[in-house]
Amino acid sequence: MPAFSLMIQGTTSDAGKSTLVTALCRLFYRRGISVAPFKPQNMALNSAVTKDGNEIGRAQAVQAYAAGLEPQVDMNPILLKPNTDTGAQVIIQGKAVGNMNAVGYHEYKSIAKVAALDSYQRLANQYQAVLIEGAGSPAEINLRARDIANMGFAESIDCPVIIIADIDKGGVFAHLVGTLDLLSPSEQDRVIGFVINRFRGDISLLQSGLDWLEERTGKPVLGVLPFLKGFHLESEDAVAKSPIKADSKAKLNIVIPIMPRTSNHTDWDALRLHPEVQVTLVGANETIPPADLVILPGSKSVQSDLAYLRQEGWEDYLNKHLRYGGKVIGICGGYQMLGEQLLDPLGLENQHANTRSTGFGFIPMETVLKEEKQLKQRQGQLAFAANAQVTGYEIHSGVSRFTDETQIAHFALLDDGKNKENSEKEGYISPDGQIIGTYLHGVFDHPDALQALLNWAGVDQAAAFDYDQFRDKEIDRLADSTEQNMNIDALIEQCQNFQQ
């Protein structure tokens, strides 16, 4: 079949771009079409690590999984990870090139675009189809110059575009018509149709609006996708604080602080979905409830998030929590916070060299931030649970060392999957068994590790839960719903005709 590309753009952030690309990846994969996801530029604190040690956006990793592929760095060549209100770490083809403010990155875009086009071309040469996800909205007037995330990229590679809008938020017709009107004539010409996402109710009541939209714009509505109750795929944007499963009789109550620069919040998705666990996410100025287990998550700016936690009363809470027998897990940045000292000699986090922050002091450890980031997938066994497999990935700039090597027990024994005799000790467990620290993101995803950690936290004979299996079923549910409400074969033909 002729090769083609298709770009999904949205009227707003969170319109459904990522989910539609995920659904189409699975549907093309089912048809035997070799398909790859691609997002030229992504801004997110929730990232993934490829097998060869590169960093990409979480959504592209999920889309690759839907397409039956291992995630590759070319699927997301530009990743921006905000570390201040006005700046971000810029990652090009999997490696950090530095911190930039908005003005600095705007000037850098011409270089970044070359990398994006280079990565796209490699995928286009390798796969029959490339499904491209835009970012935010293509109609942001102030961002149109040097755009490499939406229409600027579509124009560069000459591909068709679908615009998707979320009707659940209201104003869907204004969003679609307004977005189209703000595009240039050549950009409007490459829009092959609209998709309306998350519709609830009787579609016959929507038909008059759909007819008006098609007459007003000259563009077809390619599909109206229904709201999927209870649907969950890991998010890479803001943390959703609302529950993602129905209330249950929890055997374990977990509390997690949401910090200004919380990263990799998918770490606790498996916990939020587990039938015996209640997870409470605590934001600014909120009362911290009692808990059996506290998880300190990862952070893109550990020093400032550490100061935030102190300001919010978490230090006193943790001391009291541990005094009365509670458990604590620190993951990556949260692990560093549990130590004694955090040193930033190069000013990597706040542009001020030789800064030093005092940690909570629960682990005899100090961390020095280094310029080179550790990026790798990991596997092995939990050191405290016989035969419990653990998988995960590391994304961190800090190098930690224990200040007191006596009575150090490690969290896991990690290997390369080939030679287990050369296992590497990772993480920390306190002598009283109340505190765990680890650099492993995704530590709860493997069913063995999840069950063992729940047992450690106080759940007797915790129920098994396989997060990867759950995710695969959700992708299939999404794909089935999309297949029922869009003509996928006609869409493929439309894309092929556009690029002939």
UniProtKB/Swiss-Prot annotation:
InterPro entries to which the protein is assigned, alphabetical: Class_I_gatase-like (IPR029062), CobQ/CobB/MinD/ParA_Nub-bd_dom (IPR002586), CobQ_GATase1 (IPR033949), CobQ_N (IPR047045), CobQ_synth (IPR004459), GATase_3 (IPR011698), P-loop_NTPase (IPR027417)
Claim: Ribonucleoprotein is one of the keywords in the record: no
Domain GATase cobBQ-type residue range list: 251-449
Pathway: Cofactor biosynthesis; adenosylcobalamin biosynthesis
Listed GO MF terms: ABC-type vitamin B12 transporter activity; catalytic activity
Keyword Cell inner membrane tagged: no
Superkingdom of source: Bacteria
Residues at the catalytic site: C332 (nucleophile), H441
Signal peptide: none
GO BP: cobalamin biosynthetic process
Sorted UniProt keywords: Cobalamin biosynthesis, Glutamine amidotransferase
A Pfam entry, by short name: GATase_3
Membership in a protein family: Belongs to the CobB/CobQ family. CobQ subfamily.
Function per UniProt: Catalyzes amidations at positions B, D, E, and G on adenosylcobyrinic A,C-diamide. NH(2) groups are provided by glutamine, and one molecule of ATP is hydrogenolyzed for each amidation.
Name of the protein: Cobyric acid synthase
Protein source organism: Marinomonas sp. (strain MWYL1)
